[in-house]
Amino acid sequence: MIISSTLDYRKAAKRRLPPFLFHYIDGGAYAEETMRRNYADLQALALRQRILRGVGEVDLSTKLFDQTLDLPIILAPVGLTGMYARRGEVQAARAAVAKGIPFTLSSVSVCPIAEVQKAVGSAFWFQLYVLKDRGFMRDVLERSWASGVRTLVFTVDMPVPGARYRDAHSGMSGSYAGLRRILQAFIHPHWAWNVGIMGRPHDLGNVSTYLQKKIALDDYIGWLGANFDPSIGWHDLQWIRDFWKGKMILKGILDPEDAREAIQFGADGIVVSNHGGRQLDGVLSTVRALPAIAEAVKSDLTILVDSGVRSGLDVVRMIAQGADAVMIGRAFVYALAAAGEKGVAHLIDLFANEMRVAMTLTGVRAIKEITRESLASPDVFEQ
């Protein structure tokens, strides 16, 4: 199969993965309207082509906090990444580090912090949910800091899990889910051998380390669901800001008022995110929400964005709308499932090449030159 885009990697991943895993990463909440709008609204944002601008060389690097990135891209935290390829978090982290961008390890990863640190050193970020079990939160913060992690992505848009109807149909949850997953593995022998057998253990590495017992896939939804805390408020989180001495990014901001409160909280950055359309269906796409948030807090916070990004053109669009850098989640998992570490590295190269072409044809030489002037229709969502 010829692979030349994220969409090609998605097709390859669908063929290789058991349905319960493919639809877990591919699906959204409820009717998936927000998930579809994330992508569609980005495509509706036209770039402004300029000619004869003398763009001899394009610089894709950018400064983010105290890091210089080769690209304004970060691999987003994705739970259970290690179920998509053998020790998937390690493979994705290696690809990211080789390409000069950060990898963000999910707190509900298969590979624990120590395993990723052994593979790539301290060159990764760590993500954490707000959970009732404060002991677990403190434990993983201490272990990530001891491993050299200095950037924490704190997910704040998941006080309760979204209703993901696809999961019940695919076998991730619902009646006879365990049996259905076993049957699916039998008809996907490559995955069954390479990941199902050779990729063990399949527990939640960070949780198992804390509890000193294995938390397998069957227990994943129950453990996580029992630990979400919808009663949480800003004041309840102050201990985390006081405890964590590195950079802290709040992930899940969709409203300018919440972005302003993030400043008061002491955040160093935010991720404008609707969780890839996997939480509350019917909310704004991130590319629509981004300009108002950027206008409100751009001078005070580093702004990242995710959801719907499938190409380097989309990265340029998001930066033009006010982002400093972009996180990609589904896209890299498709590539990981299809071709492992090499697939993720190739995908990052595809994004880089697409960005170079887009920047050349819009007449900009560096990331800092991408502005609303790079768009032909910056006000398309206001019409």
UniProtKB/Swiss-Prot annotation:
Major localisation: membrane
Q: What cellular component GO annotations does this protein have?
A: plasma membrane
Q: Which GO terms describe its biological process?
A: aerobic respiration; lactate metabolic process
Q: Where is the FMN hydroxy acid dehydrogenase domain?
A: 1-380
Cofactor(s) needed by this chain = FMN
Q: Which residues form the active site?
A: 275
Q: What is this protein called?
A: L-lactate dehydrogenase
